[in-house]
């Protein structure tokens, strides 16, 4: 394939150069393709023509974490912590300010990402009943077909073994923070010593350095376990942020008026956060629902790791039980402990992103590599009194998305159009020069990376959450989001509608559904919802006829 590109390049270079210079008139945001038939590296004068230099196809490093919310990245929100290495990605590229997922749950979100299709199309609806059909089309398989090397390290969480990768090494299920097991391509399970975020990064760098063909472009998926519950920090970071006190979100003590589905959840920091499993307040005489699972996790630590762990937590445990906190004081204590543990886990993640960036720069790969950072979904940091995700409300539907752009991209700063995780697959395919199959439901972000603002860009996003009854008891629901409004329908064992004005009520506290003055808005949004359900062929659809009953 690369020989064909060189041959075509030699024939068509002058033609392409003419088009770039005279037809495009060298616009300031001119986009030079980094993969495909040919790319001109320098402009030769008419009197002294030089042989055009072939631009190598770009590499893709796609870093995804678990449950990393945008408000815990300083390139999005400076109130809580600094993430200098993640900020480097945003500073050298773009930050998407309206980035969302199609189903805010780990496995389904990953299936949407890798297929470019909604859950109703890729058939991976939830974490409890589904196994990913690995025979279906994915973007790594399509990249392989055009000569890319593909690799996956870290979290997979789709139940079946990965396919479409020249190399993979994954953690089983959620994985463990300390001394975790990994499944190899031989379907063997091995245990590695250390902290999982460091180990996944080690494997990623080792693959680039020692296991790939340097003559071929590559796509590497670095998918971390962090920052998933129950936020076990690396021992070197245990003491961080202990001097910080965080204000409770304004709606921490939300009463869920007019929102019965929100009231029925079981993800409250005050009521549902486990004192031992989540907050590490382990004592032999105390029992909680998830105590044994926590003991299993810390039981993986070696002697030195456990000694450091106990040295840090023992005085905190003693002080906590001595205080005998109750009510709102206890809720605030739990929130502070949760915030600190979460941030310590983020710190390890940010440091390891820095390791990857430094390695790519040292090896001369950074200028020809697209570096993408995102999370499988957002997360609640006390908003509505919650932890976890699942709901279509902003904190869990919204996810960070930043891209460090390769040489040849002039675009910098914020991209404000609404994008979704089904858009990643077609974006990677277009940038690599691959054909985008017609059944992919996402839309390539390349026009946005070129600085364009397409007039026909989507005006609404579709969302559908299926996993109920299950952990946290978030009811099934689907909905649409526009720049101004969000309409949500909870169904199955409930029939409840919610409407939010996102500009007047960004915290989504006031359900406007049923108010006469909003009937035209509801009518328009229901029409949009039905249109998207038909477009994506979702068998669970809003029925205008039943809605009148």
Per-region residue spans from a language model:
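Serine residues within intrinsically disordered or low-complexity segments
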Residues: 9-10, 45
């Amino acid at each position: 394939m690369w020989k064909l590109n060189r041959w075509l390049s030699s024939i068509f270079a002058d033609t392409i150069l003419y088009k770039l210079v005279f037809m495009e008139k060298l616009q300031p945001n001119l986009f030079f393709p980094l993969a495909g038939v040919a790319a001109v590296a320098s402009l030769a004068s008419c009197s002294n023509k030089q042989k055009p230099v072939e631009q190598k196809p770009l590499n893709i490093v796609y870093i995804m974490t678990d449950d990393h919310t945008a408000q815990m990245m300083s390139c999005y929100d400076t109130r809580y912590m600094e993430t200098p290495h993640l900020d480097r990605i945003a500073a050298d590229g773009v930050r998407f300010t309206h980035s969302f997922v199609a189903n805010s749950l780990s496995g389904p979100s990953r299936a949407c990402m890798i297929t470019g299709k909604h859950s109703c199309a890729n058939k991976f609806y939830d974490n409890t009943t589904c196994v990913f059909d690995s025979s279906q089309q994915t973007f790594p398989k399509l990249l392989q077909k055009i000569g890319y090397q593909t690799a996956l390290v870290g979290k997979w969480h789709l139940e079946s073994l990965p396919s479409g990768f020249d190399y993979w090494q994954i953690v089983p299920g959620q994985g463990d923070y300390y001394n975790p097991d990994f499944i190899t391509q031989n379907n063997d399970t091995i245990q590695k010593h250390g902290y999982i975020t460091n180990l996944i990064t080690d494997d990623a760098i080792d693959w680039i350095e020692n296991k790939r063909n340097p003559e071929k472009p590559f796509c590497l998926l670095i998918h971390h376990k962090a920052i998933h519950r129950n936020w076990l920090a690396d021992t070197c970071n245990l003491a961080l942020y202990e001097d910080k006190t965080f204000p409770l979100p304004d709606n921490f003590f939300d009463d869920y008026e007019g929102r019965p589905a929100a009231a029925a959840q079981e993800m409250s920091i005050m009521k549902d956060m486990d004192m031992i499993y989540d907050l590490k307040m382990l004592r032999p005489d105390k029992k909680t629902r998830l105590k044994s699972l926590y003991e299993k996790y810390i039981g993986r630590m070696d002697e030195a790791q456990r000694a450091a762990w106990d040295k840090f937590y023992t005085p905190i445990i003693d002080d906590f039980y001595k205080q005998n906190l109750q009510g709102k004081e206890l809720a605030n204590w739990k929130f502070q402990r949760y915030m600190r543990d979460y941030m310590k886990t983020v710190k390890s993640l940010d440091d390891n992103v820095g390791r990857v960036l430094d390695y790519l720069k040292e090896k001369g790969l950074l200028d020809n590599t697209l570096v993408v950072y995102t999370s499988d979904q957002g997360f609640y940091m006390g908003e509505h009194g919650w932890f976890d995700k699942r709901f279509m409300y902003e904190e869990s539907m919204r996810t960070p998305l930043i891209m460090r752009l390769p040489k040849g991209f002039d675009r910098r700063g914020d991209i404000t159009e609404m994008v979704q995780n089904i858009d990643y697959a077609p974006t990677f395919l277009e940038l690599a020069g691959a054909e985008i199959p017609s059944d992919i439901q996402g839309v390539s972000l390349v026009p946005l990376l070129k600085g364009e603002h397409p007039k026909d860009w989507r005006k609404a996003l579709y969302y559908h959450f299926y996993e109920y009854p299950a952990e946290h008891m978030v009811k099934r629901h689907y909905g649409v989001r526009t720049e101004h409004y969000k309409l949500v329908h909870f169904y199955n064992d409930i029939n409840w509608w919610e409407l939010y004005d996102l500009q007047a009520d960004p915290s989504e506290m006031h359900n406007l559904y049923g108010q006469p003055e909003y009937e035209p808005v509801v009518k328009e949004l229901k029409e949009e919802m039905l249109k998207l359900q038909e477009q994506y062929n979702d068998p669970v659809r809003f029925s205008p006829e039943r809605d009148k009953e």
